[in-house]
């Protein structure tokens, strides 16, 4: 097995193992707040870094040359943003819900051959910056989606009066609502900055890619505006965050 594939396999096992252990601990009632819960995320993130560094060395640039690499890079951005925002929003279980999504995003990279493609020409600074900014924006939308899932689970448990171990560990609903709005807003701003770089790139960009990306930006900007004006209920906000993430995820398949 080639080393890059081995790194992905190890990272998937670490993320999946951390998720399984957390669920078992919550179910058994033994879950306690501890920095040790970050360990699987830190180890998995390190393995992701090693994979991306290896692929970057092969390509001689940011490893975003095929769809499997794009998915791994988005997963890496999701974990990075989790480290930055998890504590700030008091979302202690965000990592638990993040881990399976990140593991799934790495799955295509493990099963799909990733052939190194030579650069047709030297890329400009703005071209190097363009794609990573898009991935960071999409990662923010992914975290909003995960926060939305947590909100909907808690809302369901409240409505069904199923107050068990998981309910007591989930963050308060108002924390989740704030996290959704802020992550959607952050994603919109980063994606807008990315679209701004397109005016500084001399080489023509695919029309389909431009239409899809502007579409994603426009729809998320409209959703963010509705959230800021408090015209949506908390549940509808969560559903928009969850279902809305299908749009950027689907656009990656189409563009690729």
Residue spans of the language-model regions?
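Surface-exposed beta-loop interaction hotspot
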Residues: 123-137
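Glycine-rich, flexible loop/turn motifs
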Residues: 60, 122, 166
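Interfacial non-cytosolic loop connecting adjacent transmembrane helices
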Residues: 115-125
